[in-house]
């Protein structure tokens, strides 16, 4: 037995020796740590000024990111926020689902605001799946059928498109650019499948095919094998930043299922959505809003259905970029953040919208969950039934009641504001590297 153990031990040691690394650079990742709307776009915009490539890896135009650059506010849904940096290549990866009409509408709207030369610096994966109009119709119908138990979907067709992908009758961008007769046959087949399930949807097949023949030529200049492109970039030492869409608590596996999106918006989705191996990942930046918000239905332990929630909603202008719905608001939730940090492995935190708390005399932070019988939970609940029955315990921290909006040095923040940041660091055992106190990239304070 001891000989076998010794042999196995030596083999295991050998497994970890002599590793070679073909890559000269790493991929840094920006992920939402709550239920979205944390300010990821602003963080990406800040970092994109120093990187070569910015990528989207999952989701579709159900995501909404706002970036303020040189006084102009840009809204992005499919485009990576890094497109505002003209020196940067933007990549839409294979894990993204793309509604081409929405993509080109977004391009036109942002070009009107001054975005230029996208045709030279936007690359779309040939393996990304297409979202069709009938996917959007089905999304709305499925949501309506749920009645009072709706999931709060954006009705952008994202779920049905991922369903088509999973059942292997979806259509990829590369297929649109290949033999158009083969694309037409496949399109007719997927429409017929949906009509059997949803006979009330109306699809003019010939009109759609005419439309997509035009889209094929329009999108063709942007399409590449992004997997080879990214691996070549890494071998050549190019810096790559990934912008996660949605957020950890909306992840199809790790979020508050079924009140989630249809993709993996945690670290695993970065690997599968871009074709990257784990060893390429460098920094994992968790973006945390200084309080918690959620759009749509689903459990929300620290939600404040009172004047505090109203104040946070009003001061934070908490309205969804994509849905235009008011966001639900509540206190910062440490157990939730510990959980998403476990899943994602944050190496640092960017804390955003600290200035929204400026007027409060005291600030509560959710620090633990208790079961109905009073026992403390040592894990994040895996079902919405369990999550709905917990009691939240809060720590009460002193507010600072001073404007932080124009402060640009961490040491100049009010002492209680600094304490709030350090409290989060201590509870998560993850350093807070940046603090946001306003809209533009210039309002992000470097802590260290």
Curated annotation (Swiss-Prot):
IMP binds at residues 37-40, 62-65, 154, 168, 246, 261, 325. Pathway: Purine metabolism; AMP biosynthesis via de novo pathway; AMP from IMP: step 1/2. NCBIfam families: PRK01117.1, purA. Mg(2+) binds at residues 37, 64. This is Adenylosuccinate synthetase. Plays an important role in the de novo pathway and in the salvage pathway of purine nucleotide biosynthesis. Catalyzes the first committed step in the biosynthesis of AMP from IMP. The keyword Metal-binding applies. Keywords: Cytoplasm, GTP-binding, Ligase, Magnesium, Metal-binding, Nucleotide-binding, Purine biosynthesis. GTP binds at residues 36-42, 64-66, 327, 353-355, 436-438. It catalyses: IMP + L-aspartate + GTP = N(6)-(1,2-dicarboxyethyl)-AMP + GDP + phosphate + 2 H(+). Substrate binds at residues 321-327. Homodimer. The active site is at 37 (proton acceptor), 65 (proton donor). Its EC number is 6.3.4.4. GO terms for cellular component: cytoplasm. It is an enzyme of class 6 (ligase).
